[in-house]
Amino acid sequence: GCKKDRKPCSYHADCCNCCLSGICAPSTNWILPGCSTSSFFKI
């Protein structure tokens, strides 16, 4: 399974949508709109 939004993550598979700066981000994130279907970002 994937971790909840704002939980720490190391890989894309850790999150339901995307991982930014090591944190799971919600697909409704206004900074990365539609991140659930976008490329994986790890900054």
Swiss-Prot record:
UniProt lists the family membership as follows: Belongs to the conotoxin I1 superfamily.
Superkingdom field: Eukaryota
Modified residues annotated as 4-hydroxyproline in this record? 8, 26
* Single Gene Ontology MF annotation: toxin activity
Supply one GO CC term from the record. extracellular region
Q: What is known of its domains?
A: The cysteine framework is XI (C-C-CC-CC-C-C).
Q: Which UniProt keywords apply?
A: Bromination, D-amino acid, Disulfide bond, Hydroxylation, Ion channel impairing toxin, Neurotoxin, Secreted, Toxin, Voltage-gated sodium channel impairing toxin
- In the record, which positions carry 6'-bromotryptophan? 30
Cell compartments where the protein resides:
Secreted
> Under which name does UniProt file this protein?
Iota-conotoxin-like Fi11.6
Q: Please report the organism this UniProt entry assigns to the protein.
A: Conus figulinus (Fig cone)
